[in-house]
Amino acid sequence: MRLLRLTTVIITLFAATLLSGCAISQPSITEEETLPEAVITENGSRVFGEVGETAAQYTGEIQIEGLGTFSFDPFEVKTVREDIFREGYFSLFDVLVHLEESGEIVLDYYFDHEMNTYVISSLNGHGNWWYNAFYDGGWPERSVFRMDHYPYKDKMTLNVVPVTEDYLYSVYDTYRDEVNRFRANDGKVIVPEVIIEGRNERFVFENVEVKAHDLRPEMFQPGVVTAIDTIISLGDAGLITYDLQWYESIGTADVVKSYWVNRINEDESRGRCGFVYEAGDEQFYFFRGNHNHIPSDTRVINSPQYVKYFWICI
């Protein structure tokens, strides 16, 4: 692994009130509760809980602006990204492909190697389509995450909407930058800047090589890199320690089924305070499109300009 360089260590108080409402509250393990058995890594980090049944089981719906709402059986949807998803799992884009194959819509699309994503040329004769989506317990939010990377889950809301050509092309430009960065690094995912802003500490790491750890082997093909691999890779290098916790549900969100980062070094989630994250290009930082409620263990990354984990209280 390339040497990771710690460039900044400062003490900071994070203005959590400014970020109120931007993340689902995470429960934490209290002193009265019994910790589940943990897998301990070589550097002393811990992983609590195991992956359960996560494939979609129930009839889903997709709303396409101007065309109406369509129902689909998740057992009938197949993925076009077999390089990313295992059998039984699929993306938001795959739902559109399924509707096209079922004769319910007319979808023209192609794979763009320069962006590593499928592009919609037209849907029922019209171009420039994007999506609004959120998981159970969430709310509408802007996202610039690749549609064919975004895992579908039970009880999620999925809307396909027209956008301006300028907006769509600005998103596509960041995809090209990621692919160019990936190729320039000989097929390695090397993130120029990884930022951790905890309750008590702030770290900035430069040129972090992020390796796949196959934390979600039931969903993703071996070697697929996700945002949470950033934290695990820093742990492998001895630069941080962490706790990961599997959650079946969180608060009003019945369908979570993901690992969350509960601790980084001495900062551990408590009550309504904990870590959230974002990843992508600086052009779409925070609510511009990079900060959304895709759990970091299911957010596939190519070579984003930055990954940031930060502390909030809601």
Regions found by a protein language model. Give the residues of each.
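Sec-dependent N-terminal signal peptides
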Residues: 8-17
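Bacterial N-terminal signal peptides that target proteins for export
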Residues: 1-9
